[in-house]
């Protein structure tokens, strides 16, 4: 499910009115990687499987982002997809795409 209408538009329609997402929607490599990540998230049966996919750099977040998790979008991308894991399976509530703090 989506907690962000602009993110939903980007993922489902490849377009958005949000400044960052609009810029990203024009990047073909990013959109390819985003679609690949979304396919992986839909295909795993439990969150623990994401640890096995090293290229995603899956991590539960800490400190002020505690309660959220993230995966990297693409191998060399500075962007990550943040989400909330739900109890009872792989139901994921997508929150946003952000620049990873360690990549400049």
Each predicted region: which residue ranges?
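Residue-level marker of positions within ordered structural domains that often coincide
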Residues: 12, 46, 88
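Short, charged helix-to-loop "capping" segments that act as catalytic/coupling loops
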Residues: 12-17, 24-25, 52, 64-66, ...
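Enriched for short, Lys/Arg-rich terminal
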Residues: 62, 66-104
């Amino acid at each position: 499910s989506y907690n962000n209408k602009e993110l939903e538009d980007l993922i489902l329609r490849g377009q958005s009115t949000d400044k960052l997402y609009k810029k990203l929607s024009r990047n073909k490599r990013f959109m390819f990687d985003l679609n690949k990540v979304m396919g992986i998230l839909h295909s795993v049966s439990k969150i623990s499987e994401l640890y096995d996919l090293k290229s995603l750099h899956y991590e539960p977040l800490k400190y002020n982002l505690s309660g959220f998790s993230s995966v990297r979008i693409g191998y060399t991308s500075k962007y990550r997809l943040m989400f909330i894991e739900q109890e009872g399976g792989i139901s994921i509530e997508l929150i946003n795409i952000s620049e990873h703090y360690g990549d400049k």
